[in-house]
Structures are given as structure tokens and as C-alpha cells.
Amino acid sequence: MKKLVLIGIGMLFTLTVAAQNGLKTGMMAPQFTAKDNTGKSIELKQLLKSHKAVVLFFYRGQWCPYCNLHIKQLQDSLQQLTAKGAYVIGVTPETGENINKTIEKTHASFSMIQDKGYKIMDAYDVKFVMNDDLVNKYKGYGIDLDKNNGNSDHALPVPATYIIDHTGKITFVHFDKDYKKRASVATLLKQL
């Protein structure tokens, strides 16, 4: 029964995000400036001057086991990623308090950005708004997006990953509306 419910949630999630397409390989990455979880100013343009590439990924929240697994895998391979000249950034709509919960669960030591106004999510075309049925299903599982994100917008990102080279061009995209599928570290290392 639980498996059927999860399949139903997955189907609703897929229908909800049908309009999102994400950005494509070869496009110029939208520039952004934001503060990370440590208060450090993160400016994409400046990072690309001092790093070979930026690995930019979007995640849903500390309540998502698939997000936590992906973040932990990135953290476990962070030395390999940085050895290839990459700077890793996670972007999420969740509050700073919940970013800290994500960090506690995953031991992430890379920059995590709260995209409070969805500017980055919108620029990368990964934002979607959950319909009321899906919001209520999540609430039934104890997931309160209003509390987690600090608003009642019910907006989440498609869990996408981009590699942006030093020229600002997107050289790799993983964009899958199935929230269970993420870019593997092996794939990222191969693409860097």
C-alpha cells in the first residue's frame, strides 16, 4: 500500500512539474549573487574567475531522503571534485535553519544558498509550484513545506545539476522530473 501511495505522489509530482524544462547544455549560465549558509557572498562571475568550473545543484529540502543522499555523495567526493577545479554550490528554498539541518544530516561543507525569492530557481527554470493535492499528501507524511521553506508558496525545484565552465557556459545538465534520479558523482567527475 505504501508503495502505491509513493507511486501516486511521484505521478502527481511529475504532472506538476511538466512545464519546467531547465536550461540546456551550451547556454550561458544566468549570473547570480547570494549569501551562503556561512554568510559568505557567492557571486557566480567571481567564482568562475578563480575556479575551472562550478557544480550548481538544486535540492528540495532536509526532509527529502533523495536530496540528503545526493548531498552526502557530493560531500564524500568533494576532494575529488575540487581537485578537478570545481566549486560546489547547493540551492534550495528551505530556510537557513533547515539548511543547517541538511548540513547536520549530510556533513556538507560546501556553499548552500537559500533561494528565498526563487531568483536562482527561476533563472535556471527549475522552479515549480505544487498543487494542493500534492501539498496535502506531503502533509500526510509529516512534511510541512510552509514551515520548511518559511512561506506558503509551495514552490520547490526540480532537483537539477549544472556544470558551468570558467567562461560561464553550461557544459553539463542533469534535469530529470523524477526527483529520485540525480547526477552521479562519477558522471560529474567525468564531465569536469
What are these regions (language model features)?
Residues 45-68, 72-74:
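Short active-site neighborhood of thiol/selenol oxidoreductases, capturing the structured segment around
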Residues 29-30, 53-54, 158-160:
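Short loop/turn microsegments at loop-to-beta-strand junctions
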Residues 69-125:
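Structural microenvironment flanking redox-active thiols in thiol-disulfide oxidoreductases
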Residues 115-180:
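Thiol/selenol-based redox catalytic cores and closely related redox-interacting motifs
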Residues 60, 67, 92, 157, ...:
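Solvent-exposed, acidic/flexible segments
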Residues 179-191:
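A short, polar/charged loop-to-alpha-helix boundary motif
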Residues 1-22:
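Bacterial Sec-dependent N-terminal signal peptides
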Residues 19-46:
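N-terminal "domain-start" segment that seeds a small globular fold
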